[in-house]
Amino acid sequence: MAKAIVSIFVVFFIFFLVISDVPEIEAQGNECLKEYGGDVGFGFCAPRIFPTICYTRCRENKGAKGGRCRWGQGSNVKCLCDFCDDTPQ
């Protein structure tokens, strides 16, 4: 009986260690993306420039891994600095 209780305790203890050591899933959404700031306009995200000025400026000025453009209604465009992914888009 005592061996069974000790065994169960050991199993739970190992399970706890494994769960606490598992790395967290990389941040997504708002934790990764921060707006560059200001009205950057179309020039920051012009589709024919690769990588975009948004990508380059986020890396140089904000210390981010990259930058992404989000297009809204009409000419509304936002530059979001990406602190998790360095893939140019």
Swiss-Prot record:
A Pfam family annotated for this UniProt entry: Toxin_3
Cellular location of this protein? Secreted
Give disulfide pairs as residue numbers.
Answer: 32-84, 45-69, 54-79, 58-81
Gene3D superfamilies, sorted: Knottin, scorpion toxin-like
Q: By its UniProt entry, which InterPro entries does this protein fall under?
A: Scorpion_toxin-like, Scorpion_toxin-like_sf, Scorpion_toxinL/defensin
Gene Ontology CC: extracellular region; secretory vesicle
Q: Does the keyword Repressor apply?
A: no
Which UniProt key words apply to this protein? Answer: Antimicrobial, Disulfide bond, Fungicide, Plant defense, Secreted, Signal
SMART domains, per the entry: Knot1 (SM00505)
Q: Tell me its family.
A: Belongs to the DEFL family. Protease inhibitor I18 (RTI/MTI-2) subfamily.
Name the record gives this protein: Defensin-like protein 195
Using the UniProt record, give the first listed, main subcellular location: secreted
Give GO BP annotations, semicolon-separated: defense response; defense response to fungus; killing of cells of another organism
Q: Which organism is it from?
A: Arabidopsis thaliana
